[in-house]
Amino acid sequence: MGKYYCDYCDIYLTHDSMNARKAHNSGRNHVANVRDYFAGLGGNQAQSLIDQIIQQHESGGRNQMMMAPSMRLGAGFMNPLATQPGYPGPPPPGAFPTFPPTAGTPPFRPPFPPSSAPGAPPPTMPPFLPPNASAGAAPGIGMGSTPPFPPNTASPNPGMPPFRPPMGMGMPPAPAQAQAQGSPMGMPQQGQQGTFTPTQEVPQGAGAGIHPDRLRMLGQ
């Protein structure tokens, strides 16, 4: 372990860390030694020395901030992440940051499973068919064509009536009740009681309500 040497106190610190340096610099003996050292120098020499120390401190502080945390001096005040156990360290400049995995988190899976040999298809994909594999296939099925759909063998719903065919395709005849009704125009049909044809005679009592021209046509 390296040791830090203090020029003002002329001693070596036990630990070379930022916390140990701060504790030593804030001590009473170190402050008194620094005051005595600058008091023994001349005014101009002391001022130039102070300016050099300030310049070196500012340039060194900027360099410390621009450096990666793992390359800084010690761990603790300037590099708190290096003191945490299990932390992989900061990424290099230009890379994405990484975080330590939490307990119970599965590792990251690759996007594709590794193949057994270079150029071989993945285990989940079937191998490609040769070019002449469609020679013995059924007609209509070849390379690039989709197989036909299976026939619909599902039974109809038991609660639904059977499908009725369209008009003109095996429709049953109209019931006899519909034929027994009157014609659309309201004219009586042949075979009903109280009807007559033009060749028959006009019933008795029917001339009063018939037009004269109609009677002449009937031979009255």
UniProtKB/Swiss-Prot annotation:
Provide the coiled-coil residue spans: none
Asked whether the UniProt record includes S-adenosyl-L-methionine among its keywords, one would answer no
Q: Where is the composition biased (Pro residues)?
A: 88-130, 147-165
User: Which spans does this entry mark as compositional bias, Low complexity?
Assistant: 166-200
Q: Where is the composition biased (Basic and acidic residues)?
A: 211-220
Under PROSITE patterns, the record lists:
ZF_MATRIN
Its keywords, alphabetically, are: Metal-binding, Nucleus, Ribonucleoprotein, RNA-binding, Zinc, Zinc-finger
Q: Which GO terms describe its cellular component?
A: commitment complex; U1 snRNP; U2-type prespliceosome
Where is this gene product found? Nucleus
Q: What SMART domains does its record include?
A: ZnF_U1
Q: Where are the zinc fingers (Matrin-type)?
A: 4-36
Keyword Translocase carried by entry:
no
Quick one: where's region Disordered?
A: 88-220
GO molecular function annotation: mRNA binding; pre-mRNA 5'-splice site binding; U1 snRNA binding; zinc ion binding
Q: Which GO terms describe its biological process?
A: mRNA 5'-splice site recognition; spliceosomal snRNP assembly
Describe, as the record does, how this protein assembles with itself and its partners.
U1 snRNP is composed of the 7 core Sm proteins B/B', D1, D2, D3, E, F and G that assemble in a heptameric protein ring on the Sm site of the small nuclear RNA to form the core snRNP, and at least 3 U1 snRNP-specific proteins U1-70K, U1-A and U1-C. U1-C interacts with U1 snRNA and the 5' splice-site region of the pre-mRNA.
Similarity annotation: Belongs to the U1 small nuclear ribonucleoprotein C family.
Q: What does this protein do?
A: Component of the spliceosomal U1 snRNP, which is essential for recognition of the pre-mRNA 5' splice-site and the subsequent assembly of the spliceosome. U1-C is directly involved in initial 5' splice-site recognition for both constitutive and regulated alternative splicing. The interaction with the 5' splice-site seems to precede base-pairing between the pre-mRNA and the U1 snRNA. Stimulates commitment or early (E) complex formation by stabilizing the base pairing of the 5' end of the U1 snRNA and the 5' splice-site region.
Name of the protein described by the UniProt record: U1 small nuclear ribonucleoprotein C
Native source species: Cryptococcus neoformans var. neoformans serotype D (strain JEC21 / ATCC MYA-565)
